[in-house]
């Protein structure tokens, strides 16, 4: 039985019913409907911390999904799982894939910046200030892009950019 049919959460069930109705009404392919079902089941598993199951569903959704915009959110969710599991290298890889398909995704840019900032902090703690500065510059690069897309968000990042003197760095978009 698909995860979406065994979910006990009222809101998730309501969303599932509404989404299924919309998919029945809209003229979309069977493949698109299947991709959405896997994506939805992946989100459900992810919200319950069942990351292995979520990844299986997301990979199947990626295989079936044809729309680049929809695929970008699947890549983003896969990146979130890898971030939660502490695999920053894989997380960055999937955030990049999401951004390749959807460059206007400030949350992916922010999450990449957070990873680079954390890596910079680790390098600083280990006394490698040159590496720390390079990683902080990477964090600034991604935070500035995120802030350009969502200027009312990421207030802490904006403050960090100002206090570290990185708010004036030129970045290529």
UniProtKB/Swiss-Prot annotation:
Entry-linked Pfam families: TPR_11
Main location: plastid
Annotated TPR repeat ranges: 35-68, 72-105, 120-153
Gene Ontology CC entries for this record: cyanelle thylakoid membrane
Keywords: Cyanelle, Membrane, Photosynthesis, Plastid, Repeat, Thylakoid, TPR repeat
Membrane topology field: Peripheral membrane protein
Superkingdom of the organism of origin: Eukaryota
SMART domains: TPR
Disulfide cross-links: none
Subcellular localization: Plastid, Cyanelle thylakoid membrane
GO annotation, biological process: photosynthesis
Its biological purpose: Essential for the assembly of the photosystem I (PSI) complex. May act as a chaperone-like factor to guide the assembly of the PSI subunits.
Family: Belongs to the Ycf3 family.
Protein name in the entry: Photosystem I assembly protein Ycf3
Organism from which the protein derives: Cyanophora paradoxa
